[in-house]
Structure formats: C-alpha cells, structure tokens
Design a protein with these regions (language model features):
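Mature N-terminal segment immediately following signal peptide/propeptide cleavage
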Residues: 37-45, 56
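Conserved active-site tyrosine of GNAT-family acetyltransferases
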Residues: 50-55, 119, 151
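N-terminal secretory signal peptides and thylakoid transit peptides that target proteins
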Residues: 1-18
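Vicinal oxygen chelate
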Residues: 24-35, 57-110, 116-147, 160
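Residues at or immediately preceding the N-termini of alpha-helices
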Residues: 7, 47, 111-112, 149
C-alpha cells in the first residue's frame, strides 16, 4: 500500500469515526427536545369554591364548559369540571385521579411577610411554613404550604 493510499485510508477512517461520534453526540443531545412546561390537568370537585379561591389569590382564570384554567405566567393548570372527569367517554386523563390529586409549587417573587399578608387577606390558612425545601431551580428556597377548597396542596416557594 502506498503512502498516499495509507493517508487516504487514515483520513477516511477519521472522517467516518468523527461522523459517527458527531451523530452519537447529536442523538444524545436531541434525545430530549422538551423545552418547557405548558400545562397540567387535574380533576376538581367544588367548582364555585375553587374559582373563588384562585381569584382571591390573584390568579387570572378562564372558564369553559369542561375546565377552569388557572394561569401562572406562561403556564396553566386546567381543573377539569366534575362533568368532564366523571364522563366515561373522556379518556385523556389519569383514570384513577380524583380530587384532591394536585401538589403545585408556585414561585413567589415577594417576601415571606408579603406572602403571609396576601394569604391572610384571602382567608387562607397556612398549613406549614415557611420551611426550607429543595426546588426546581436546583437550589434551596423557603416554602409555605396551604390547601385549596378541593384539598390540593399549594406550595409557595421564595428563592433568595
């Protein structure tokens, strides 16, 4: 084999190995293309009480015949009305889920004193907190826990 042929074979091998490695890297990086969280859905039982509760807490809501949507920034929680989640024809849900089945953590941008005052104004009893908890931002925050009228757990986390 000539020197030129050897070099060509070497370069071909290196290019092939590089392409394979690059392809594997791209595959590994592209394996999870999830870029954010849009919404979640949970069943609700006490529609009027739930709507009043989330409004008292200052959330923006929309309603339709199937759900009440509570907006948190660019995400939302869809609370399915009983007529929706109890309908056997509605299968796009967790079949065993019944109220209360939610455990939601909201990021609070104010102080602990402001949170406590807001909850008191809304007539909401604090179940626990503030206590330190690990959060989704991969650091510790201060959490305060309450329950909504259906019994779902709401956590308000404050990051320093």
């Amino acid at each position: 084999m000539s020197t030129t042929s050897s070099r060509r074979a070497f370069v071909k091998g290196m290019v092939a190995a590089g392409a394979a490695a690059g392809s594997a890297t791209l595959h590994a990086q592209g394996a999870n293309r999830v870029s954010g969280f849009d919404h979640m859905a949970v069943p609700m039982q006490n529609t009027d009480a739930m709507v009043a509760f989330y409004r008292r807490l200052g959330f923006q809501l929309t309603e339709n015949e199937n759900a009440v949507s509570v907006y948190i920034g660019t995400q939302m929680i869809n609370f399915h009305r009983p007529t929706r989640w109890q309908d056997p024809a509605f299968t796009l849900r967790a079949p065993a889920a019944k109220p209360p089945s939610g455990d939601f953590c909201f990021v609070w941008s104010g102080s602990a004193m402001e949170l406590k005052a807001m909850l008191e104004r809304a007539g909401v009893k604090i179940e626990l907190g503030p206590v330190d908890r690990a959060g989704g931002r991969r650091k510790t925050g201060s959490s305060t826990y309450v329950r909504d009228p259906d019994g779902n757990l709401l956590e308000f986390m404050i990051y320093a």
